[in-house]
């Protein structure tokens, strides 16, 4: 078999196939052709990736990439590809009034695979600082459903930022929350809920959710957390996770707390997905990128295989793209991440300026996106 690209000598970690071993990986025409234990093929280009970790292309389940239209958004290709990410889910930067523009200006033009959640607010996050749902007139559940029907496979779900200063307190907050739930049900998709300082408790939210719905910022601090007054994970949340409710990190500028994460993980409450909530306010710290966020979970005691699973296989399942994304199975799209694991002493900062010193850090050396190689360093040049 004549390959277009052959990666040799790397350690393949692919949780979708229970793989963690040195393999060669061959690519033909943008598709993974083979995973073999010995390089018996010729290739137009061969790269020795010994010492690197080969994973399915990382999937960031929470970022904001509606650049130039939403002030906090960032450039998908400049940040995602450099951070080892091949697929980005934009978490509600656009609503029903501007999702068509988001698709035209971003989804259809960038190299990164970009999908989008449709914000319950018709204007998305264009004026996020003012609270996009403080005026009830901006809530557009019918428009959300129409948008998802108009852009199948690109508009993949519903987003609401369920903080009291965004959706309102008391009954107003509940009304907006329930409109978002209804939009998800009516569109036959799923709902991502940003939890901030919410007008309801997490246990009060849970009865309205169904398997596949997602609570993001699950390790935030503040008044609304996954821990009850006894510093225990709410039993309702443990039951919800077993039922199929998704818990996502969404690190962000204000939504990851070392103490909450340490306590919850010590009690066996492991999130489904690792994501960044990357945007202008955290791009240069404390988030930086996906590998840095993943490294924080290595420090919390999770295994490399688990961290990669939470960044590839599980997000693909959330998106309904398991077997297509988040895997290195032959015949699938050649979306691949090359990671390097460094040993040393590294500062890891949460969203509350708390620093932990970790001994292992991941960085992205490069990616393959649809068979095209992008390198971030001279290591493989």
Residue ranges of predicted features:
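Histidine-rich, glycine-flanked metal-binding segment
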Residues: 1-55
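C-terminal cap of metal-dependent C-N hydrolases
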Residues: 10, 333-381
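Metal-associated gating/positioning segment near the N- to mid-region
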Residues: 41, 49-109
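Hydrophobic faces of well-ordered beta-strands that scaffold small-molecule active sites
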Residues: 59-63, 88-90, 114-118, 156-160, ...
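Short, acidic/polar
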Residues: 69-77, 137-148, 199-205
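Metal-cofactor-binding active-site regions of metalloenzymes
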Residues: 83-89, 93-94, 109-136, 159-162, ...
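Active-site core of metal-dependent hydrolases
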Residues: 164-284
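His/Asp/Glu-enriched, well-ordered alpha-helical/loop segment
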Residues: 259-342
